[in-house]
């Protein structure tokens, strides 16, 4: 119970970091940590295969885009989160998160949530989550190929867009 609450609060903490970033560098790190803690929450609840697939697809596809975004920005002196502006942005989102928790506690019945997992129905020879790999390659093979093609196409589009801007932004290289 306490571990899932710890990762839940960590997830909200990193989401606040994503939404209140004042520099691209901290936003990317916060987004990667948000994905990591979200996948840990999924794995803790019993969806280990889903967490692994989401984490690998997310990091494999999106970090390429983030790397090119950081290359485009090239801030020599990025602002830090400890600056007054960053503290004010983070404070707004913390207050908003606290209000959502207080309002949602009564409306959505958050207090009744337990620490049940996917396999809480009883003992079984095969876990519910372990059949995901065979289904991914059997039924979901076409969708997997389309996602791969989309990521590949996005990679080349961003590469072409960044190519001309990189020469303008960094004339010394």
UniProtKB/Swiss-Prot annotation:
GO terms for molecular function: NADH dehydrogenase (ubiquinone) activity. InterPro entries: ComplexI_Subunit6, NADH_UbQ/plastoQ_OxRdtase_su6. It comes from the Eukaryota. GO terms for cellular component: mitochondrial membrane. It is a multi-pass membrane protein. Its main location: mitochondrion. It catalyses: a ubiquinone + NADH + 5 H(+)(in) = a ubiquinol + NAD(+) + 4 H(+)(out). Keywords: Electron transport, Membrane, Mitochondrion, NAD, Respiratory chain, Translocase, Transmembrane, Transmembrane helix, Transport, Ubiquinone. The chain crosses the membrane at residues 12-32, 47-67, 94-114, 142-162. It is found in: Mitochondrion membrane. Its EC number is 7.1.1.2. Core subunit of the mitochondrial membrane respiratory chain NADH dehydrogenase (Complex I) that is believed to belong to the minimal assembly required for catalysis. Complex I functions in the transfer of electrons from NADH to the respiratory chain. The immediate electron acceptor for the enzyme is believed to be ubiquinone. Belongs to the complex I subunit 6 family. This is NADH-ubiquinone oxidoreductase chain 6. It comes from Pelomedusa subrufa (African side-necked turtle).
């Amino acid at each position: 119970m306490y571990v899932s609450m710890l990762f839940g609060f960590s997830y909200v903490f990193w989401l606040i970091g994503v939404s209140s970033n004042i520099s691209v560098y901290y936003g990317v790190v916060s987004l990667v940590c948000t994905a990591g803690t979200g996948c840990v929450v999924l794995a803790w609840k019993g969806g280990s295969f889903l967490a692994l697939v989401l984490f690998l697809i997310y990091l494999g596809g999106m970090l390429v885009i983030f790397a090119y975004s950081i290359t485009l920005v090239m801030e020599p002196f990025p602002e830090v989160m400890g600056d007054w502006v960053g503290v004010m942005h983070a404070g707004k989102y913390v207050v908003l998160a606290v209000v959502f928790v207080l309002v949602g506690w009564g409306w959505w019945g958050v207090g009744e949530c337990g620490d049940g997992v996917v396999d809480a129905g009883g003992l079984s020879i095969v876990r519910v989550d372990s059949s995901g790999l065979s289904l991914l390659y059997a039924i979901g093979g076409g969708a997997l190929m389309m996602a791969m093609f989309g990521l590949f196409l996005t990679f080349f589009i961003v590469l072409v867009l960044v190519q001309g801007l990189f020469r303008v932004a960094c004339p010394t290289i």
